[in-house]
A protein has these predicted regions:
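Sec-dependent signal peptide recognition
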Residues: 3-11
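C-terminal motif of bacterial Sec signal peptides marking the signal peptidase cleavage site
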Residues: 15-18
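Bacterial signal peptide processing site
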Residues: 20-23
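Short amphipathic, basic-aromatic surface patches that mediate peripheral association
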Residues: 33-44
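Short coil-to-beta strand junction motifs in C2/discoidin
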Residues: 45-54
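Exposed aromatic-hydrophobic patches
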Residues: 97-104
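A short, solvent-exposed beta-strand micro-motif common in secreted/extracellular proteins
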Residues: 108-118
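Short acidic/polar inter-strand loop motif in beta-rich domains
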Residues: 117-125
């Protein structure tokens, strides 16, 4: 009976170590599922318009959350400084659904998302997602 317990615990240990080793060997990634509403980003005539979305890989979210839209959009390298690991740009048309696979640096702790809406003052243009490094997830 003791041999069965030892074998069982050895098996569990090896399975857990295998999962940990896989995280060390395979680069982390995240699937970002971004869906633009059909009426997104209306122009002055109320017609939907495309929107540009930036995805930032960050080591910390502090600087990202303290900056205004134009500072991040126009001077992201300057204002985010050492927190910025990488940046992706995605352009979405009204009604479009985009699944983007981001291969992330092991240093990435957060994803900062900025949408360049026409009416920034009345928009929810910023989103921050804490990266789960223990698994590979889809963020919507």
């Amino acid at each position: 009976m003791k041999q069965i317990y030892k074998s069982f615990f050895l098996f569990i240990f090896l399975v857990l170590m295998g999962c940990s080793a896989a995280n060390l060997v395979v680069d982390p990634y995240a699937d970002l599922e971004i869906t633009a509403n059909h009426n997104i980003n209306p122009d002055s005539n109320g017609r939907p318009s495309p929107v540009v979305v930036y995805v930032f890989e960050l080591t910390s979210n502090t600087l990202f959350e303290s900056q205004d839209f134009f500072s991040i959009y126009e001077e992201h390298e300057k204002v985010l400084g050492p927190d910025l690991v990488n940046k992706y740009e995605i352009s979405l048309t009204p009604g479009q659904k985009e699944i983007y696979q981001a291969s992330m640096s092991p240093k990435t702790e957060y994803l900062g998302i900025v949408a360049a809406f026409r009416d920034i003052e009345n928009s929810n243009w910023r989103q921050v997602i804490k990266v789960d490094k223990t698994g590979y997830n889809t963020y919507q």
